[in-house]
Amino acid sequence: MCDLSSALIKEGWYLTDEGIEECKSSSEKEKTSPTDIIQVALNNDLRPIGKSFLPADINSGRIEKLEGPCVLQVQKIRNVAASKDHEESQAAPRMLRVQMTDGHTACTGLEFKQLSKISLNTPPGTKVKLLGVVQVKNGILLLDDSKIAVLGGEVDHMIEKWEFQRSLAKHSRRNIGAEGGPPPFVPFGQKCVHKEQVDSRALDQRKTLQSTNAVKSADDNDEFEKQRTAAIAEVAKSKETRTFGGGGNAGGNLANPGSSYKSRDTYQRKREEREKPWTENKSDGVYRDLVDERALRDIMEMGFNREAARQALLDNNNNLEVALNLLLTRANQPRAAPVEQSRPPPRGKGRGKGRSRQDEDEEAGGRPSGPSTLFDFLESKMGTFSIDDSKPSQQDHQTKMNFSNSDQMSRDAGQFKPPPRNDGRSQRNDRPPRFQKDGDFPKPTPASSSFSQPQKWRDGERTGRGGGPERWKNESQDARNAPVSYSSSFSKSREQQGASGKELNKEQDGTGPASFRKIQSNGPAPPKFSTPADPKMRNEPNNRRKGRPERPNSGYFEHSQDALGKKDFQDEGQFVKVGPVSNTPLPNGDLEHRRTGPIKPHFSAPPPRQTNMHNPASKRRSGPIKGPRDSVDINNFVNWKAGDQCLALYWEDNKFYRARIDAVHPSGSTAVVVFSDYGNCEEVLLDSIKPLHMDDDEDVYYENSLEFRRGGDGQPRRSRPTQQYYQPPRARD
């Protein structure tokens, strides 16, 4: 057996012992020689009887050569130089790829040179013998006639399969264009030729991919059209453009601060329409209020109630950011003062429909809270001016009598009732820092309220923001009378007015009372500026508008001190205004509002409590401040006289200093005080003076605001507060 196996290996046949025995049994001869076994093995498949002799990694590319002789069985032959459909093509030189096996390991040989005995017609199962050393490149055996010999042989089951596949390949494209066959190939640029060889009706019935319900029924279409028509009608009735899933003006409060402010009246109309039952003009089950449910859920998760969140989204076209800003603004706003029984609820003048200013501010949520431009910011710090103060209406002065009954007069329904404004308006709309919101406190007497600035400023605002023609008429008439005197608007006697006029003339001549003409030369006065009573300072807005220097000359300081003596003991409203009345509108949209009283209206520091009876937040500044001050009403009940020790509010830094009362005005509205620590004198309102024991009861300091003042020497002030971050204002119409 070993000799037989060795003899077969010399011939290149690697057969297993079982294979040799099988070949012996298949041979008809009793004594089988290696030649007989080879003849039998030629017609048998090597896979069951062959022994593995090819390297296992012959296909890995690491083998560079294969030494023969060895016999392999052809598995498949393919012409790789032609397409599979036309392997017999002679358009390109033939290159055969021969797949062979030793029964266990398969390898690939490539026709490196022309093989004369192997072709595409060589059937699988044919045995070939590799001779000598065959080169192997990248796992491919390089074959030529010198390296390979065809031994022949036929393996029946392999030949049958091969012939069957070849016959199928010849007939596979014969049914082109027929039913069930592939479509004919149409060259590019030519039209398709349709060959209807079958009945098209029968073919349509057999189409399984046809949609059975491609067209909706007429009833479905009618229902859809009805819903669509109802939805369009509903949108038309609501008179607003609905934006789904958010809104086109996200961050509007930053990118376009005036967008919501300009459409305030439109929002009011929309709100009133929403308050009506929507079921009146919508079809049931067809349309409903379109609120972004996701945005609504997000807002509710933050702790807001559903109704408020829903309304905010409706008001802002489902804009989540703007609606959230609106809700936060409402939550942070201070509560409005309770409305008294004898006083009807305040109306927003000039805007109709009973809207108060607070409602409008709430609706325009997300508006900036400070000046939007650098010019507006500087105006707010240096003082914003309006013409309204120089034209106090008769209606205002008729309601002012004295401190004792001013509270009742402020509630008189027949007189002027200023609407409550948003507490933050003084910061946002560049109000003069000393004249603030009219609220729960009574109006002052004629002495202290001839320049009741909150009322005047609000009048000016209404005038600039859509006040009625009557308002324009009254104010223009007052403007013509203002340069002459304010005394005509008071109910005081002619005698007192005449006396006041004489005193004023004396003061202008420099012959006023000596007690009011103290020069601030005996001590470092806290202010470096002129007193608020300086007529030049009162005319300063006009001076600036006329192009005059912002800072007066060196003689101005002395003249401003002399102005202390010019504070005649008449009502504040009777001071003759020096210079024409200005009606110049400011760049930020507010009318210039100026006053002629002793307290400067255009400095950024809060005034000496001249409107405390009129405004709960009169101490608020136009810039960022610490907070509103409580009014000092204790002065209404203190009978001040010359020589009394007190705490007096200094107008520039809004702080109380120890002072001595030098003289009290006959009207009981103002007094001249001498600051004990500095020696300079100031005329201040009585409601800005408090007893010494109140020193600890009230916070008199206002910090965190940067003050821009006119008429100074250009030098920085001592202990100047730091500036808070800048906040742009809300936009204006």
UniProtKB/Swiss-Prot annotation:
It is found in: Cytoplasm; Nucleus. InterPro entries: RMI1_N_C_sf, RMI1_OB, Tudor, Tudor_TDRD3, UBA, UBA-like_sf, UBA_TDRD3. Residues 639-699 form the Tudor domain. PROSITE patterns: TUDOR, UBA. Gene3D superfamilies: 2.30.30.140, DNA helicase RuvA subunit, C-terminal domain, RecQ-mediated genome instability protein Rmi1, C-terminal domain. Its main location: cytoplasm. Residues 392-408, 446-455, 484-499 have a biased composition (Polar residues). Component of mRNA stress granules. Scaffolding protein that specifically recognizes and binds dimethylarginine-containing proteins. Plays a role in the regulation of translation of target mRNAs by binding Arg/Gly-rich motifs (GAR) in dimethylarginine-containing proteins. In nucleus, acts as a coactivator: recognizes and binds asymmetric dimethylation on the core histone tails associated with transcriptional activation (H3R17me2a and H4R3me2a) and recruits proteins at these arginine-methylated loci. In cytoplasm, acts as an antiviral factor that participates in the assembly of stress granules together with G3BP1. The Tudor domain specifically recognizes and binds asymmetric dimethylation of histone H3 'Arg-17' (H3R17me2a) and histones H4 'Arg-3', 2 tags for epigenetic transcriptional activation. PANTHER family: SURVIVAL OF MOTOR NEURON-RELATED-SPLICING FACTOR 30-RELATED, TUDOR DOMAIN-CONTAINING PROTEIN 3. This is Tudor domain-containing protein 3.
